[in-house]
């Protein structure tokens, strides 16, 4: 949700008193302008003060022009409302915080203020007290620049009616029709209040009704709880992921010092909640049904290697949900560039927490695998030193493992995905290779053999493709056989040729030259040779 700075600009209504010495041309410009309401407005034009509105319209237009220049954000969101107060006409100018940090806001606003004096008031500063001011977190000295969220608009600005409400401008799509339409304003306010009520009810439902634990109830705590809940839903555990998911949201929390301090705490709390209450399927399975899965890269890789994508998808889904008992591991086997790492990497990066097996360090190979949602074993080998722990982890059993510079820690049942082009069921012990653990290891795995090389422009599997594939698997589940080799299927057999397609067999050309004489001639020649031999 974007954050906004609020600048309150007072608008002169008594030109002689508020702008002493202003030129006649300025007075004529203000007096000559006539305003009309758009056709979809239900406001009363007679309740609108047109002369101050002319000045206000020029002020907001020039202010936004300068704001876009200093913020370097031409698409920055804004909402401006012109109101008639008890003492003065004034504008509430809400501008998105994007591009302007709080520490330099005062400097930029001073520049904009001088521009408005020169361009609009011909160098004459209004005598209105504090006519150009940014809203602070508290009155008096020491308050920081206040950042409000979008809820400020339906909470405070939209409920205003005539004659207090004079005019409004915005580039926010959801409020365009409500600027000058009182009925639409009421509808949006009611919709917002309903949403707030539902959110509060949902927060109450999420709390343990049998718990008597004290809960701080305030706007600050509600906003913090909303932030942590959003981070958990999106699986965000770092500031980098937050920026990639919603840059405006991240910047809005950096705009003020009080909200900036919540960032690391919220990420830390969200991570703890995810590790304790969420599992891999919560992030691997997408929310929306998939209509066409044929363009999905995981689907293409499996189909290219002769697997039935629906059956293979059911294997992946059951693996993620730990449905197959001790057969807790998927082994993607094959040479380079066949997509095995492409699939495993995408699955691992889709969940908030994944661990990698460091098989090169035999002392602490599973150091990174504690409290993870998925374990990824990339291009490794099975050694006699780690095979017993590996069998427990691959089989989804609880096992304690040594950790570097720490005491041993327990690895809970966690889905494992292995990518390798070597035999992971052969145990290497020094210079020898043994197969005594082959059957137990095979009983813990589903093996996919990927042998078809991918084109150079095939591309990387994305997180969304992973979620779509698992969602499609959930909607098309089939029965899976508990076998080491995942059966292939879906390949089309070439039909037998018909009689019309069968041609006469070609004559085979002999490669050895045949003698030119017949058998009879050969016998006569042998007789002549025998007779000549006797005569000698």
UniProtKB/Swiss-Prot annotation:
Key words, A-Z: ATP-binding, Covalent protein-DNA linkage, DNA replication, DNA-binding, Endonuclease, G1/S host cell cycle checkpoint dysregulation by virus, Host G2/M cell cycle arrest by virus, Host nucleus, Host-virus interaction, Hydrolase, Metal-binding, Modulation of host cell cycle by virus, Nuclease, Nucleotide-binding, Viral penetration into host cytoplasm, Viral penetration via permeabilization of host membrane, Virus entry into host cell
**Ranges for the PV NS1-Nuc domain?**
1-199
> Which InterPro entries does the entry link to?
Helicase_SF3_DNA-vir (IPR014015), NS1-Nuc (IPR014835), P-loop_NTPase (IPR027417), Parvovirus_NS1_helicase (IPR001257), PV_NS1-NUC (IPR049901)
The UniProt entry's GO biological process terms, in alphabetical order, are: DNA replication; symbiont entry into host cell via permeabilization of host membrane; symbiont-mediated arrest of host cell cycle during G2/M transition; symbiont-mediated perturbation of host cell cycle G1/S transition checkpoint; viral DNA genome replication
Q: Which PROSITE patterns match?
A: PV_NS1_NUC, SF3_HELICASE_1
Domain named SF3 helicase is located at 308-463
- Please name the GO terms that the record assigns under molecular function: ATP binding; ATP hydrolysis activity; DNA binding; endonuclease activity; metal ion binding
Q: Does the keyword Ribosomal protein apply?
A: no
Q: Quick one: where's region Disordered?
A: 196-216, 488-536
Bias class Polar residues marks the residues at: 196-211
Q: Where is the active site?
A: 156
Where along this sequence does the record place binding of ATP? 334-341
Motif RCR-3: which residue numbers?
Answer: 156-160
Specify which residues bind a divalent metal cation according to the UniProt entry for this protein.
83, 90, 92
Which cofactors, by name? a divalent metal cation
Q: Which GO terms describe its cellular component?
A: host cell nucleus
| Catalytic activity field | ATP + H2O = ADP + phosphate + H(+)
| Gene3D superfamilies per record | 1.10.10.950, 3.40.1310.20, P-loop containing nucleotide triphosphate hydrolases
Main subcellular localization, coarse class? host cell
Q: Where in the cell is it found?
A: Host nucleus
Q: Which residues form a coiled coil?
A: none
Which EC number(s) does UniProt give?
A: 3.6.4.12
Q: How does it assemble?
A: Interacts with host TOPORS. Interacts with host KCTD5.
- Report what the protein is called: Protein Rep68
Q: Which organism is it from?
A: Adeno-associated virus 2 (isolate Srivastava/1982)
